[in-house]
Amino acid sequence: MISFSDGNIHDIDHFVRVWNYAKTIAELEEIDPETPLILEVAAITHDIACPLCREKYGNTNGKHQEEEGVPLVKAFLSDSGMTEAQIERVAFLVGHHHTFEEIDGLDWQILIEADYIANATENGYSKCCHSC
């Protein structure tokens, strides 16, 4: 993914943050044994379409990321050794990581939360109760 990101430090930092948050949340939730692999791969690849979206649309709008990311992540993972079902679930998560309705699994919920926390941190959001 680092090569795929064309060395964009923001993108690399972001997907590593999302992966770290997702991994931590999953460990604390004690989820089933197969889900962490799918979740962690989805966390690392969730913004796989950002370079393409910047080039094609001039921005990284979430809906564009979801649409463009599915075929990219399927191709990226095609020789990874993951099963077709695992790749399909990762692709589904990449294709829905900006969709907050009808969340159908803990992997999707955790990915949404991890991405939100990373975005909030990167954008300086805070719920500070005292003067900083």
Annotate each language-model stretch with its function.
Residues 36-58, 69, 91-98, 115:
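His-Asp-centered metal-binding catalytic motifs of divalent-metal-dependent phosphohydrolases/nucleases
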Residues 2-6, 53-60:
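Short coil/turn segments at secondary-structure junctions
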Residues 33-35, 86:
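Membrane-helix interface segments
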Residues 18, 63-79:
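An active-site-proximal "capping" alpha-helix that borders the catalytic cofactor pocket
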Residues 84-91:
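Active-site-proximal substrate-binding core of FAD-dependent oxidoreductases
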Residues 3-16, 20-32, 45, 82, ...:
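Divalent metal-dependent phosphate-bond-processing catalytic cores, especially two-metal-ion Mg2+/Mn2+ enzymes
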Residues 8-11, 59-66:
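Flexible, glycine- and charge-enriched loops at secondary-structure boundaries
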